[in-house]
Amino acid sequence: MKDVPGFLQQSQSAGPGQAAVWHRLEELYNKKLWHQLTLQVLDFVQDPCFAQGDGLIKLYENFISEFEHRVNPLSLVEIILHVVRQMTDPTVALTFLEKTREKVKSSDEAVILCKTAIGALKLNIGDLQVTKETIEEVEEMLNNLPGVTSVHSRFYDLSSKYYQTIGNHASYYKDALRFLGCIDVKDLPVSEQQERAFTLGLAGLLGEGVYNFGELLMHPVLESLRSTDRQWLIDTLYAFNSGNVETFQALKSAWGQQPDLAANEALLLQKIQLLCLMEMTFTRPANHRQLTFEEIAKSAKVTVNEVELLVMKALSVGLVKGSIDEVDKRVHMTWVQPRVLDLQQIKGMKDRLEFWCTDVRSMEMLVEHQAHDILT
């Protein structure tokens, strides 16, 4: 049995400036107000004044461990994550988290958060295989939770960092966006916003199978790069989203300075040419999606002889559906893959909808005026 009153009294004497906080903890503990005590401890462990040295480890050993069985499991893990940060030996931290996981197994969210913390530690020490296995286990558990919870953001932060470490651009792009979707970006320091926006932008450009940039372009995190020396990345992303090959080539003096982009120039060119074909299809009226080889060649900056190969590539990866008329050198498109649109593309849709409404009104007037002739 630990001497909790003695520890609290000693702590009050050791730090006169924080005596009121320690006194409050003692008061709530003595009154057995476990919920209020939990909230007070959560505030306590996040206070930089107390999060120094091994103070939180001592707090856990001499105080929290005495009533942890009365604490909400998820709140307990939240508290313990702060304690673990003061453990310099990863092995000790991992053992501590494993024991905690057993204590909170009644709550799926608490177990998920605990496993995510274990995965983060494994990633930090370079154990990629165990990190991968942990991510797969946790993802399966997350899929069974209703809606988005407080543990989702921590999981997506871990999974995106893992994919970044192994160089899987497409998976990083997907999960890093999910992470941002679970938090308020204003809570991140500007420097972190800029770093996340930059790595996300690069991953989107380089990611295999990533043809949807609308969600990133509409996210406020990207604004952190505006009016900085990385503004060129925003311009490049907008060029890709609209399939503007000419703008992409004009920006080469900027993106060409980035080693990863420069090394993958051929891949980037093919991707933006495919996006150009998608945009050409999307902006055409549904009843007029006949594209000539010459039109495609001009917009995508390819030769007429290369058009058929470009269209076949777009068809094979499921970006568009349609058929190629080799004799007339035309492509008839019937479908284009849905994407998140930027504001300019939404405006284009609005204009086309207004044009369609005008057509409908004209037909209505025609029928109204000539109904007698038609019926007789």
Swiss-Prot record:
Transmembrane regions listed in the UniProt entry: none
GO biological process: ubiquitin-dependent protein catabolic process
Pfam families linked to this entry: PCI, PSD13_N
PROSITE patterns tied to this protein: PCI (PS50250)
InterPro entries: PCI_dom, PSD13_N, PSMD13, WH_DNA-bd_sf
A GO MF term: structural molecule activity
Ranges of residues in domain PCI: 171-338
Entry keyword set: Proteasome
Disulfide linkage: none
Keyword Nucleus on entry: no
GO cellular component: cytosol; nucleus; proteasome accessory complex; proteasome regulatory particle, lid subcomplex
Family: Belongs to the proteasome subunit S11 family.
Oligomer status and interactors: Component of the 19S proteasome regulatory particle complex. The 26S proteasome consists of a 20S core particle (CP) and two 19S regulatory subunits (RP). The regulatory particle is made of a lid composed of 9 subunits including PSMD13, a base containing 6 ATPases and few additional components.
Function in brief: Component of the 26S proteasome, a multiprotein complex involved in the ATP-dependent degradation of ubiquitinated proteins. This complex plays a key role in the maintenance of protein homeostasis by removing misfolded or damaged proteins, which could impair cellular functions, and by removing proteins whose functions are no longer required. Therefore, the proteasome participates in numerous cellular processes, including cell cycle progression, apoptosis, or DNA damage repair.
The protein's name in its UniProt record: 26S proteasome non-ATPase regulatory subunit 13
